[in-house]
């Protein structure tokens, strides 16, 4: 049973410094670490939404446990980008996996501010990915992000847990050659310059964005008063930005469904969505907004933030008064951004005048190896506190389904689907 600790009350906890953006899930350090480890069969990812009501938290945690058991998991990694009330979901998931004989390694922001509000006997190994010396949540996007180093620690600790459970990876049987189940080919085209022009085009490393690309979109969204699109050159970060709503990649499907086939991706450019309400100037946020001078409000070169060498395609949304506090308003902002990116995708899908780097990813069955699952506990409470699944395009929003609308019932996705952008953060 989960036992509550004396914390003086349970609060929500998801701030700018720990949030996993769409870009973070697209470049997920845990997915990469587990998929690349030769000792594991990475059987899949369970995406579990945080619920509002305690009974629902327990219900979805039990379903995660059932899925883990169905996948014949020997161990699990459980990651969450929130604290406070969200930790009820976190410890319940670890408990339900443990009841079914699946030991877990957890990853969460803890530090001084995010200490667990509840616990149980199965919560015995949690990696604290706090990066702040003060140990407190901040309004700097990416400051307390889960990194490659955290993922490396998780892999090592999972092996230690398996050893204690009598299933050391060294003693796993070799039952034959690995079998590639699904193949994803990613072609990445490097962008060297981004500028405005008469039409949207990509030519020999230059991305041109049509002037006024956002104008017609404003008329489609009643909850949005205005949209401003600008281009931020690498290093030119000494200017004010409104609160961050997301960072996302520019990618498109050329062939196949998300997680297989061929995807085209642009490197050297990242999309940044920000927003503010008209009149009141309210900055959309949960426990802290991230508005301010850009160079002070983001840690670059993290999985969920742009590279310091990237151009940034900045989509700034002016909400009608009150709409930055509604689920519909936040979704409208993400819709507008995706429509803008969609115009770029229409060019990217047929791109043939540039060199590219080629990466091939496979979901792999490894007979006899220890089976490990990754559980991503994501927001599912609505407003700017939700997650959307399976958009039409990699990292997109159009066509997706919100976790809250799905009652936060867990999704099971493949590692390749995660790599191909099936998770979109509405944060």
List the model feature ranges, each with a label:
Residues 1-427:
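An N-terminal assembly and electron-transfer interface module characteristic of large anaerobic redox
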């Amino acid at each position: 049973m989960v036992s509550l600790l004396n914390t003086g009350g349970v609060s929500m906890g998801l701030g700018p410094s720990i949030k996993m953006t769409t870009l973070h899930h697209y470049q997920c350090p845990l997915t990469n670490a587990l998929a690349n480890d030769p000792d594991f069969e990475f059987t899949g990812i369970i995406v579990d939404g945080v619920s509002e009501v305690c009974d629902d938290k327990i219900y979805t945690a039990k379903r995660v446990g059932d899925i883990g058991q169905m996948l014949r998991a020997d161990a699990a990694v459980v990651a969450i980008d929130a604290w406070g009330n969200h930790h009820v979901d976190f410890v319940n998931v670890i408990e339900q996996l443990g009841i079914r004989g699946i030991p877990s390694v957890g990853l969460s922001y803890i530090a001084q501010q995010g200490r667990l509000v509840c616990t149980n006997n199965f919560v015995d190994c949690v990696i604290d990915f706090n990066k702040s010396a003060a140990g407190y949540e901040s309004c700097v996007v990416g400051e307390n992000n889960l990194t490659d180093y955290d993922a490396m620690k998780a892999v090592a600790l999972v092996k230690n847990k398996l050893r204690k459970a009598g299933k050391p990876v060294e003693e796993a049987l070799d039952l034959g050659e690995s079998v590639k189940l699904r193949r994803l080919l990613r072609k990445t085209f490097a962008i060297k310059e981004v500028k405005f022009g008469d039409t949207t085009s990509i030519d020999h490393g230059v991305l041109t964005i049509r002037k006024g690309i956002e104008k017609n979109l404003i008329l489609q969204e009643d909850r949005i008063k205005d949209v401003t699109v600008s281009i931020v050159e690498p290093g030119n970060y000494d200017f004010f930005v409104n609160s961050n709503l997301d960072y996302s990649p520019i990618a498109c499907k050329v062939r196949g469904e998300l997680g297989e086939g061929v995807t085209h991706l642009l490197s050297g450019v990242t999309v940044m969505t920000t927003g503010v309400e008209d009149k009141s100037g309210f900055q959309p946020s949960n426990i802290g907004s991230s508005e301010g001078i850009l160079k002070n409000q983001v840690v670059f070169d993290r999985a969920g933030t742009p590279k310091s060498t990237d151009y940034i395609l900045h989509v700034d949304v002016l909400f009608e008064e009150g709409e930055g506090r509604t689920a519909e308003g936040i979704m409208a902002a993400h819709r507008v951004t995706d429509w803008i990116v969609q115009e770029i995708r229409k060019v990217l899908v047929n791109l043939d005048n540039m060199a590219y780097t080629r990466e091939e990813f496979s979901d792999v069955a490894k007979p006899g190896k220890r089976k490990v699952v990754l559980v991503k506990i994501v927001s599912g409470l609505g407003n700017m506190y939700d997650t959307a699944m399976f958009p039409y395009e990699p990292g997109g929003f159009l066509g997706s389904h919100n976790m809250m609308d799905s009652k936060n019932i867990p999704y099971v996705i493949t590692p390749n689907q995660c790599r191909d952008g099936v998770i979109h953060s509405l944060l």
